[in-house]
Amino acid sequence: MTIHIYNTLTRQKEEFIPLEENKVKMYVCGPTVYNYIHIGNARPPMVFDTVRRYLEYKGYDVQYVSNFTDVDDKLIKAANELGEDVPTIADRFVEAYFEDVTALGCKHATVHPRVTENMDIIIEFIQELVNKGYAYESEGDVYFRTKEFEGYGKLSHQPIADLRHGARIEVGEKKQDPLDFALWKAAKEGEIFWESPWGQGRPGWHIECSAMARKYLGDTIDIHAGGQDLAFPHHENEIAQSEALTGKTFARYWMHNGYININNEKMSKSLGNFILVHDIIKQYDPQLIRFFMLSVHYRHPINFSEELLQSTNNGLERIKTAYGNLKHRMESSTDLTDHNEKWLADLEKFQTAFEEAMNDDFNTANAITELYNVANHANQYLLEEHTSTVVIEAYVKQLETLFDILGLELAQEELLDEEIEALIQKRIEARKNRDFALSDQIRDDLKDRNIILEDTAQGTRWKRG
């Protein structure tokens, strides 16, 4: 089975064929580290970590690079407001980023380059563009000359004349064309700066990724990925810079994930409806958040609400409960061989369907459907009077493998005796208040955690299943 990827560049699904056999070069745009990331910022790391995990599962050696922009207008503004220097703020939020995405199940990239640690190659890249006539200096700034790059607009699929007409920035004294963009910005008084052939300053945003991608992955990479909002102008400008310099294709497959809405409204700081990962992982299990994010195809928008999160949690708990029941039954199973082939053949079908979903542009939504199928099938098997260790182990291994591909964990924390007693007391109060819906919900939730309740004349007794 071959993998097909929807390529933003061609607007169609294409068979994935890496430049080098069994090797994948992948670049994912990382955050500007001036604050904690919100859940919209967290979607790309989770999505493309899953892509990476699946490629590795299929036998590819994935070189995965994701950068940190640690000098930027937003960082400078934050430094001025807080009375701290830019490096201090950047270091703090790099650490916070790692804490957040690690909690969400993301592995570290092969390399996490920082702009400030690669200033020499960025300046060299800009100088080469100037030498080739693709860039020009203007009063200490350096701009990319878009009209010189014939393919400008090919990622956003817009003619350059239309892009120029819709450009927000008018031609100023420094720029020759509205679409020209900054490669180097002259430092303002009091700003952090680096020495360059054009004076003191710092790089523009777009050039940073081009330079670091080239340094760590070469002139042409297999997959370049990021949020949908980066397609234009960021990724469009990366293509222009890189291909103008090398004359080679910059990236062969472009992947972009969709937006996140909050309660059916677009998430934005202006509306004040954004949710920081730093906060939400204190309210909800980070694994649930990842499972929720992967329950929707990465190119589609996600509507984020507590109701949907709770519904997703119920599904995740069903799978975890099935897994726990399998592990528990393993001890009492035998080497029974009757009917083994039938159950194992069904498991093979689920595995194939899971891989077919992932091969189809990493459709995690359909892949998760197969997790539910495995769990339901396992529950049916556990109704058998006699169960086989071979089949039980196959179920357990399959669930563990598929969860690992998605960056998820199956371990379910065991409830403490005191927690169980507290829930039973809450159920007793609910029954006194004739809130039978809540009473039943508590009983069912405990059952899902392998806690069996028995109501007697002497009170409610419980035992672990």
Curated annotation (Swiss-Prot):
**EC number in record:** 6.1.1.16
What CDD domains has UniProt attached to this entry?
CysRS_core
| GO annotation terms (biological process) | cysteinyl-tRNA aminoacylation
As stated in the Swiss-Prot or TrEMBL entry, residues carrying the post-translational modification Phosphoserine are: 270
Molecular function per GO = ATP binding; cysteine-tRNA ligase activity; zinc ion binding
Name of the protein in question: Cysteine--tRNA ligase
Q: Which family does it belong to?
A: Belongs to the class-I aminoacyl-tRNA synthetase family.
List ligand-binding residues for Zn(2+).
29, 209, 234, 238
Please indicate if the UniProt record lists Kinase as a keyword.
Answer: no
What does the cofactor section's free text say about binding? Binds 1 zinc ion per subunit.
Per UniProt, which keywords does this protein have? Aminoacyl-tRNA synthetase, ATP-binding, Cytoplasm, Ligase, Metal-binding, Nucleotide-binding, Phosphoprotein, Protein biosynthesis, Zinc
Which parts of the sequence bind ATP? 269
Gene encoding this polypeptide? Answer: cysS
Catalytic reaction annotation: tRNA(Cys) + L-cysteine + ATP = L-cysteinyl-tRNA(Cys) + AMP + diphosphate
Q: Give start-end ranges for motif 'HIGH' region.
A: 31-41
Q: Single GO cellular component annotation?
A: cytosol
